[in-house]
């Protein structure tokens, strides 16, 4: 199942200015595939809105708890507040509309 994770942080916790957070991002990036796999998840895509201090990650996983556990193990909870949304593709949504 697909989950869109929305991650927000304050400007003072931004990897662009906080060296400790930047180091965490570099470690997370290097270990992401392995950590996600340990929770039965895979990375499907990611987007960053630098000025809004928002990150969006699309994760395929067995359930929201696995996605949340992976986010914690990746260290994302250290500087972000996360919201996890179950999502489907637009084609799936349109295909599910009543005739």
Residue spans of the language-model regions?
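Short S/T/G/P-rich N-terminal loop/turn motif that feeds into the first structured element of a domain
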Residues: 1-44, 48-53, 62-66, 88-99
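A generic structural motif
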Residues: 55-57
């Amino acid at each position: 199942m697909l989950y869109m994770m929305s991650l927000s942080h304050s400007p003072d916790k931004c990897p662009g200015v906080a060296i400790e957070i930047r180091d965490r991002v570099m470690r997370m990036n290097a270990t992401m595939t392995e950590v996600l796999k340990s929770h039965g998840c895979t990375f499907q895509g990611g987007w960053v809105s630098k000025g809004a201090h928002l990150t969006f990650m699309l994760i395929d996983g067995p359930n929201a708890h696995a996605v949340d556990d992976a986010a914690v193990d990746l260290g994302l909870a250290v500087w972000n507040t996360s919201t996890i949304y179950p999502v489907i593709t637009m084609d799936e949504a349109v295909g599910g509309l009543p005739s």
